[in-house]
Curated annotation (Swiss-Prot):
Subunit structure: Homodimer.
Catalytic activity: N-succinyl-(2S,6S)-2,6-diaminopimelate + H2O = (2S,6S)-2,6-diaminopimelate + succinate
Keyword Signal on entry: no
Protein name per its UniProtKB record: Succinyl-diaminopimelate desuccinylase
Organism: Polynucleobacter necessarius subsp. necessarius (strain STIR1)
Cofactor needs: Zn(2+); Co(2+)
Source taxonomy: Bacteria, Pseudomonadati, Pseudomonadota, Betaproteobacteria, Burkholderiales
Binding site for Zn(2+) 2: 107, 142, 356
Amino acid sequence: MSATLKLTEALIACHSVTPADGGCQDLIAKRLQAIGFHAESVVSGPENFQVTNLWAIKKGKAGDQGKVLMFAGHTDVVPTGPLEKWTSDPFTPTIRDGMLYGRGAADMKTSLASFVVATEEFVTTHPDHQGSIAFLITSDEEGPANDGTVIMCERLQKHGQRLDYCVIGEPTSVNTLGDMIKNGRRGSLSGKLRVKGIQAHIAYPHLGQNPIHLSAPAISALVETQWDKGNEYFQPTSFQISNVHAGTGANNVIPGKLVVDFNFRFSTESKPEQLRERLEKILKDAGLEFEIDWVLGGSPFITGDGDLAGALRKAIKAETKIDTELSTTGGTSDGRFIAKICKEVVEFGPLNATSHKIDECVIVDDVVPLKNIYRKTLEQLIA
């Protein structure tokens, strides 16, 4: 069994449903300290939601003049769902038919193990490496993400820590290992719209104001609006309604209020304040009496096809013979926080088809190649 597969299994065996770390970061820290890293654990969050974060760094021979490459990821996993639906225990790593099963196998404990072993191999073969290597690991990525990477980035910025490159181990591959790198993510802006009406007996509509009827034209306009056209990196901004609620449950009462939950996934062609203003104008022009609670989940970020993406492309090509694709599709990630303090941020990892699913798994034969890709990226950028 390879060192990478063995460490992956050890990490999967740790029960680490958000915000628990389950001992994963301790395993990682000990491995890194053994090869010369300075490691620091930072616990944050309220007593009922304690988050564990790990920062580790090994300075290169060039000191502060050298480049800094950071591996970033998360040790927390989503809940298992019904245990009886799993073919094997989700926290007992199990190899079956060429697949490694377990919660977090794809998202993202295989990547974490690959980071560590790639770094061990790199440091052994390049003891005088010029650039520095860093790790930023959290146990609060799958949850609220209020006490994880975001506070660690603020901490690093406060201490003046420069970052040049960051590889996040999210599972980005689609059909085969290496076919996709995420070099950016769309922003996320959510809102809860409350439209005021007047409750009344449904037989006397003249005595009430039905907020569903009043809102229908405006909602239709929101759905049909082209918010932007996107660009070479991003699809056009999308507006989606996720929940609609009105009424008392009785079929003879005009509701007094309509509540609509919605979300924008927006490109760099739009700014949050522009989207808010345009949406509110449509509602005001419709004569609605309303209020909205807004939540900005993250701003979009993009890393062009520069040094980091280029090095990762070459590493993938050398290991898999695949010409990879750069993409910004998918949901938000902790890259939205890291991009504020790091020049180049990309995400790359194993196949994502089973992430968060029952019987989550990775292809066993992908584990060592993934590690090799990370190591070859280090060799190109900081050796």
